[in-house]
Design a protein with these regions (language model features):
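Bateman/CBS regulatory modules and CBS-like beta-alpha motifs in cytosolic regions of diverse proteins
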Residues: 1-29, 35, 40-42, 47-48, ...
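Short, basic and Ser/Thr-rich N-terminal targeting/leader segments
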Residues: 33-34, 130
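Generic detector of contiguous secondary-structure segments
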Residues: 36-68
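Short hydrophobic beta-strand motif reused across regulatory alpha/beta modules
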Residues: 49-57, 137, 144-151
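A short, polar/charged loop-to-alpha-helix boundary motif
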Residues: 57-73, 152-160
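Gly/Ser-rich helix-loop-strand patches that form or flank binding pockets
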Residues: 127-129, 133-134, 148-159
Length: 160
């Protein structure tokens, strides 16, 4: 049996975020599509980085130190993003958080693979670097993504 290539199991309809999107936009994308992270691209589908739930949560925690309100993180987490707050400092922080560009908090140093790479090698890299997803690039353009879930599903389907 031949080696399984990344192209055999990768997802080709990749949900992405633009580097110019706001954190509000990215949060909506991740929440609606129930994703823990997504590739960040430019207008030409070139990979710029990755944004994850952790990046967004770290940004929320940043405001903990800046605000004088008791438990500001609870305020930011407990209400929808479009909520207007009575406290002007909290309102300003919520607006600043929502309008922060994705490019300001995304991870830029991203592990990538190609469609012709062997999935076993990609999995080993994912485990070594402790990443959930690896963008698949062809000539610098995002053509897919392979996730731990894709690999587990392939094991279930006996592709691996």
């Amino acid at each position: 049996m031949g080696q399984i290539k990344v192209r055999d199991i990768m997802t080709t309809q990749v949900i992405t975020v633009l580097e110019t999107d706001t954190i509000r936009d990215a949060t909506i994308t991740l929440a609606v599509d129930t994703l823990s992270g997504a590739p960040v691209i430019d207008d030409d589908y070139h990979l710029c980085g990755i944004i994850s739930e952790m990046d967004i949560l770290n940004l929320i925690m940043k405001y903990e130190a800046e605000l004088k309100v008791e438990n500001p993180v609870l305020h930011l987490l407990a209400f929808p993003m479009d909520t207007k707050f009575d406290d002007p400092d909290l309102e300003a922080a919520a607006a600043k958080f929502s309008k922060t560009p994705v490019k300001d908090i995304m991870i830029r140093d991203v592990i990538t693979t190609t469609p012709d790479a062997e999935i076993v090698d990609t999995l080993a890299l994912m485990l070594e670097k402790d990443v959930n997803r690896v963008p698949v690039l062809e000539k610098g353009v995002l053509v897919g993504i392979v996730t731990r879930s894709d690999i587990v599903f392939s094991i279930y389907k006996r592709k691996i």
